[in-house]
Amino acid sequence: MPIITLPDGSQRSFDHPVSVAEVAQSIGAGLAKATLAGKVDGRLVDACDTIDRDATLQIITPKDEEGLEIIRHSCAHLVGHAVKQLYPTAKMVIGPVIEEGFYYDIFFERPFTPEDMAAIQQRMRELIDKDYDVIKKMTPRAEVIELFKSRGEDYKLRLIDDMPDEKAMGLYFHEEYVDMCRGPHVPNTRFLKAFQLTKISGAYWRGDSKNEQLQRIYGTAWADKKQLAAYIQRIEEAEKRDHRRIGKQLDLFHLQEEAPGMVFWHPNGWSVYQVLEQYMRKVQRDHGYVEVRTPQVVDRILWERSGHWSNYAENMFTTSSESRDYAVKPMNCPCHVQIFNQGLKSYRDLPLRLAEFGACHRNEPSGALHGIMRVRGFTQDDAHIFCTEEQVKKEAADFIKLTLQVYRDFGFTDIAMKLSTRPAKRVGSDELWDRAEGALADALNESGLAWEYQPGEGAFYGPKIEFTLKDCLGRNWQCGTLQYDPNLPERLDASYIAEDNNRKRPVMLHRAILGSFERFIGMLIEHYAGAFPAWLAPTQAVVMNITDKQADFAAEVVRILGESGFRAKSDLRNEKIGFKIREHTLLKVPYLLVIGDREVESKAVAVRTREGEDLGSMPVTQFAELLAQAVSRRGRQDSE
């Protein structure tokens, strides 16, 4: 009979097969009440599942990350229960867990309205209040098919067809409602009280726009109402920081239907863009990169040779001229290989680091576009390092160090690094993969920072390092990458003369730090809520007069600051000074300079910050020094 080993090493013996819930009850009533599921020998199971052999067991409660996922998955099933009660003709599709929430895809003859969503949420609360048990039944395949046929659930039947090897399936019963799932799920609806539906959007069956359109109901769920309230507060703050809203408020950019997914940069936004580009240009030049420029429209032949045409053609914009087919480049790498291939290269020329602020275009689905975060036309801070296999570790280590420095300059200090390793389907020998993964792992170790593996997540031709930033709202943004690639040099016949006078293929390291300028600027807007640090701010200082008598000196101050390389402007309107201060505070200008008669007399400026701090009156040269110090700090914290 089973001996159960618990996480603390203690053991409990039972003289009969025992469920996870019964083990929890034997430990204590409090734990039993909190039990959601169990992890038996590392595998998640339902609380009702029995253990009939010696095993290790971890009791899963709402405090565990796995417990939170179970709550969210069960809430998706609860959406199904409520929808089928309110709209019996609706057909249920799938309801998975996503980051911080869940959704359910549903086919219904008319669009759901906000009133429908409110009714669904209310019915879910009523069902939770019934405090009913969720019943699991492992059911033979044929019975499952008959059940869903009798209920007219066509999409469930299609999903069953996708699983021909499944002889029995888990059915979870919420009273009269039943759904099919691998589980586990909560044993009772009392665990689902801290939830909220968040939005409705469109979706397509199997994610294919050629298929029928579905409706997707999103929601979030948490272990308790305190966590839910904190999440809602964070989402409300995120809405206030939405880059689309702030972009309009600060006159940074706009998008319009005539050019979907293409950004119209206004002077203020283009100023931020230019600061980024000039900063990255200097950083890369200081680290041994040479800048290049390649065509945006390239013959189809090159994309066929590189492999992009067969794998990526549907995402490429194409055109024809004089009986030749062309593609607008979606990426820069094949073009950089063409530069490498011009002229004979020696091992002495390596590593060769080619960088480009490359304008790329990708035919993203219109439904996936989102402000400047997800666009069709974008610029990458792209570079490709051509090197020998022996140089990979040093190049990777140098890149990691550079990338972390750049992120700190932009105010990001919480950075996760991950190494994606060989997938099941891959090219190249295991020995080659061992060396490639080992070189990248050694480079990560040299950084002295924590990192983790992502097993099986590498490209089919090589491993990859990913950098993920956490912003002030705790959101993760995947930005930088370093991709090991021996494949493209082979396809495009890149070679160099090795020390033994034989031709060899270089290793190509694809790397980006910001990713796309558009997306990174969107991140910065939301991270800073538009209140950019002084070095990024479109206008670093605004000079305001109190009366017309100070207009000439105000213009003189703007001239002096401009000649010192600062972005300053004047506001000489015949408005009250309090009105001007409020307006430029809302425009998030870092420094507000007020000039009255005393300032004209003493050749000084009265300095305020956008946060409302009064820095007092000071000579213009002293303010210029203060601003220069603020700019030199970039986005770093004072303690850094």
From Swiss-Prot:
> Could you tell me what the cofactor note in this record states?
Binds 1 zinc ion per subunit.
Q: Which SUPFAM superfamilies match?
A: Class II aaRS ABD-related (SSF52954), Class II aaRS and biotin synthetases (SSF55681), TGS-like (SSF81271), ThrRS/AlaRS common domain (SSF55186)
Can you say what this protein is called? Threonine--tRNA ligase
Q: Which reactions fall under this protein's catalytic activity?
A: tRNA(Thr) + L-threonine + ATP = L-threonyl-tRNA(Thr) + AMP + diphosphate + H(+)
A GO MF annotation of the entry reads: ATP binding
- Annotated Pfam families: HGTP_anticodon, TGS, tRNA-synt_2b, tRNA_SAD
- Species of provenance: Pseudomonas aeruginosa (strain ATCC 15692 / DSM 22644 / CIP 104116 / JCM 14847 / LMG 12228 / 1C / PRS 101 / PAO1)
* Any single GO CC term annotated in Swiss-Prot or TrEMBL for this entry: cytosol
Q: Which UniProt keywords apply?
A: Aminoacyl-tRNA synthetase, ATP-binding, Cytoplasm, Ligase, Metal-binding, Nucleotide-binding, Protein biosynthesis, RNA-binding, tRNA-binding, Zinc
- Oligomeric form and interacting partners: Homodimer.
What does the similarity note say?
Belongs to the class-II aminoacyl-tRNA synthetase family.
**PROSITE patterns named in the record:** AA_TRNA_LIGASE_II, TGS
Give the record's GO biological process terms: threonyl-tRNA aminoacylation
- Functional description taken from the UniProt entry: Catalyzes the attachment of threonine to tRNA(Thr) in a two-step reaction: L-threonine is first activated by ATP to form Thr-AMP and then transferred to the acceptor end of tRNA(Thr). Also edits incorrectly charged L-seryl-tRNA(Thr).
